[in-house]
Amino acid sequence: GTWTASFGDQIDVVVSNNDGMGMSMFNAWAKDNKVPTFGYDANSDAVAAIAEGYGGTISQHADVQAYLTLRVLRNALDGVDVDTGIGTADEAGNCLTEGEDYRYSEEERSYYALNVAVTAENYQDFTDSTKVYDKVSKQLDSSKSPTKKVWLDIYNASDNFLSSTYQPLLENYDDLLNLKVDYIGGDGQTESNITNRLGNPGEYDAFAINMVKTDNAASYTTLLNK
């Protein structure tokens, strides 16, 4: 591409903020030229490419991200403490380790999955990016956590990480948490592409909203207030 044509031998290392671009550079130029290339997301193709010389990537702990997304909803629906099944074991035995798997910010009232470096030494542990995390893989009792219906959107259905890793993980967790989820994929450009498919909010018990632009919350809350 343009960078290799312009700089060629001057490029010593390639660092990308996502594996989609990192792998494009690796396959098109860096692999043959033996230039170390690093990405972010730990997508399955990038992890597999480490065996072929891809320098490494960063796992966002997507398995924890997806679990936290649905677990916070599940806890709210069940009327239990928000930390249930997260930092505090639930009755099934699901429990994460704070400081290793996630951190919690009381000020921001937010859970954050913690990043993990994926290298030649440990990449084989990350070859299946859609595998549920063992620590939180136990089925909930449907008599205590009955099936609920959730509307969940992903702002860009074409995003590599969201479509190939995050959504498949959500789909693997929703059954374990007794959630029937309708997944809505946006175009990554306009809020209306998503909100146009929220015409019947009364049909759902909970909503997980991933906005295209972070200042467009009113586009959704206006619909939910009807």
Where is each model-derived feature located?
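Short, solvent-exposed loop/turn elements at domain surfaces
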Residues: 47, 124-129, 159-164
